[in-house]
Amino acid sequence: MEPGRNQLLVAILLTSACLIYCKQYVTVFYGIPAWRNASIPLFCATKNRDTWGTIQCLPDNDDYQEITLNVTEAFDAWDNTVTEQAIEDVWRLFETSIKPCVKLTPLCVAMNCNITSGTTATPSPPNITIIDENSTCIGDNNCTGLGKEEVVECEFNMTGLEQDKKRKYNDAWYSRDVVCDKTNGTGTCYMRHCNTSVIKESCDKHYWDAMKFRYCAPPGFALLRCNDTNYSGFEPKCSKVVAASCTRMMETQTSTWFGFNGTRAENRTYIYWHGKDNRTIISLNKYYNLTMHCKRPGNKTVVPITLMSGRRFHSRPVYNKKPGQAWCWFQGNWIEAMREVKQTLAKHPRYGGTNDTGKINFTKPGIGSDPEVTYMWTNCRGEFLYCNMTWFLNWVENKTNQTHGNYAPCHIRQIINTWHKVGTNVYLPPREGELTCNSTVTSIIANIDSDGNQTNITFSAEVAELYRLELGDYKLIEVTPIPFAPTKEKRYSSAPVRNKRGVFVLGFLGFLATAGSAMGGASLTLSAQSRTLLAGIVQQQQQLLDVVKRQQEMLRLTVWGTKNLQARVTAIEKYLKDQAQLNSWGCAFRQVCHTTVPWVNDSLTPDWNNMTWQEWEKRVHYLEANISQSLEQAQIQQEKNMYELQKLNSWDVFGNWFDLTSWIKYIQYGVYIVVGIIGLRIAIYIVQLLSRLRKGYRPVFSSPPGYLQQIHIHTDRGQPANEETEEDAGDDSGFGLWPWPLNYIQFLIHLLTRLLTGLYNSCRGLLSKNSPTRRLISQSLTAIRDWLRLKAAYLQYGCEWIQEAFRAFARTARETIAGAWRGLCEAAQRIGRGILAVPRRIRQGAEIALL
């Protein structure tokens, strides 16, 4: 019995201690390296701010540090706000720079057209000689297989400067740009697409200058980059993550089939593959030096002719029957590069087709697609080239039995299908003079189609894929430096103390360096981290504000002006939001803020030594709204308590006791009590009145004669005085007015006594009826009291037993230590005596030796 009682006592003690000590409360931390995905506007930075499209970008000085994070993060090049912004911004710059001309010439009028002589295309031989930069046909523009463009001469009538007269005009058109009633391109013709365009503004010739810029995150936000070499556009668990404030430089070249002058080329071939379908973007190995050179021979003139006031028509005299003929040739080890693409595809984890590279073929899109899909479409100094890549594909696939070569015939078009939005733009005819442009081929846009036995790499016209390759390994995050975690400390009442010591600012990304550290280690440096965070945000805001001030006159020119303002506003909103949130919780100017709000889930606790703050944030994200609401309610209650406490403190001043405003509340309480008593008396009176009515009595305010019949009050009849007149004297029928109120008061007292007596008897009867229940409750309370006494006795006995055990332990320890000390002292004495006896022993030994 005794051991069981001791075990019960120990269990009770442990349980009580756990209930007291293990209670956890919500603690707010500020300056924690945690984040969530964001989708806010980015702004640009560039080295070349002289071009029209980048004049409002921040100056780039290459001082953008990257910090390695020991975290795991998900990346997706297609579901990515960074790439989506790049696609939209490049499209806007492209549209604004090129300025499509929607004032068609010669509008929608009937034209009489005839095919010019000698415009048939020259047939190409079955085999074509491979050319390079030293080939003579390049300079002479007569390489084998380059035919002439089909041209039709048209004339039409239209009013000119003289509105009442019509004038005849002549013009040369490509046969593919007109629709005629005869199949051979003659007869009555109309310009193709003339009824699908809208007249809105005039246009001039512009160059599409290649612009390189980088995106930067606004203050309070950051960019993460997947640094894994095996990253293929979709990676749910990238373990090599770095944090940066800006992206790498990106190229704004637009084209189909190929990507030119990209910044992602490496000494290897790798593939970005869409997570849900067969869309890919293939980065080519820069080791093979793949280039493309395009040329449009010159000696052509474009002469504007005025049709009428404010409207111009551009005529194209034909000199060499090739007004829009251009061509491109490819240099580098293309055959080996394409072979490496096939080998890389066969090893890709997403690929499920044949591993035989001989059955993996490059193919062009099917017939019937838009020209931008059927042909390779690119921009060369503001002109749009459409190149037939059949010869080129036969060459890289080594199809010697078909026409093949390393160059492709191209033509320039005015009617262009837009690449980002559905629509058609019409541009001015080609400018005069020779056009040349050189580009480095860095990627291939393709769709992978596999049926198990054969795989086709079909070239694609998805221009947007180019920017997914450029920036697909980045993601934008919003830094959330205010997380919650449970701790055993509870808030104590004290005034918040501001830290006044300065800290060295490492930049906005400095505090993210601890993102991979354990929660306990990261929380130890909160003071420096939070101040670094705030200082970095303020610094970035100031830089943006300076740029906006310098360029406020040009904000309307490009998309960057608006994005800079948006970034500035976003940064201020985030900073104010964080500070307002901390203030609403009563945690302003605190890095670690303990609260009185209990932790909602005791089973959900962090591993301070092994868990990062980012991992903890993902686990408790669903509790954020409830905890935030509880913290706000606790702070409101705390403010109410402080207000009441401050009001009580006002009584410490002796002069406040004589302040009438301090007593108004208590005076009000007294008035309320008096009014309540009066109301109670009125209620009792009404109850008694109703009670008398039920028993057949007349109301107490009936006439005196009727009332005196029930309560007989006899009075003596008074004699009139001698001086009274006849009018003053009279018979009052024996009634006196003054005795009646006294008897009535006695009557009310009697009724009140009976009422109270009745209430007392009723309550006593009710209690007597509930005596069994009271006895049962009394017995239960007695049993509980006995049980508590028993447990208290157990607890007292256990405490006495523990105290006795401690006293016995203390006695034993004291005796043991005393014995050990005595033994140690005796041993030290013996050693000392032995040391002191050494000279004597030596002397005695010497004496014996001498004897």
Swiss-Prot record:
Residues 113-153 are annotated as: V1. Residues 565-581 are annotated as: Immunosuppression. InterPro entries: Gp120_core_sf (IPR036377), GP41-like (IPR000328), HIV1_Gp120 (IPR000777). Residues 691-851 are cytoplasmic. One of its GO terms (biological process) is symbiont-mediated-mediated suppression of host tetherin activity. SUPFAM superfamilies: gp120 core, Virus ectodomain. Residues 453-459 are annotated as: V5. Disulfide bonds join 44-57, 101-203, 108-194, 113-154, 216-246, 226-238, 294-328, 380-437, 387-410. A motif (Di-leucine internalization motif) lies at residues 850-851. Specific enzymatic cleavages in vivo yield mature proteins. Envelope glycoproteins are synthesized as an inactive precursor that is heavily N-glycosylated and processed likely by host cell furin in the Golgi to yield the mature SU and TM proteins. The cleavage site between SU and TM requires the minimal sequence [KR]-X-[KR]-R. Palmitoylation of the transmembrane protein and of Env polyprotein (prior to its proteolytic cleavage) is essential for their association with host cell membrane lipid rafts. Palmitoylation is therefore required for envelope trafficking to classical lipid rafts, but not for viral replication. This is Envelope glycoprotein gp160. The gene is env.
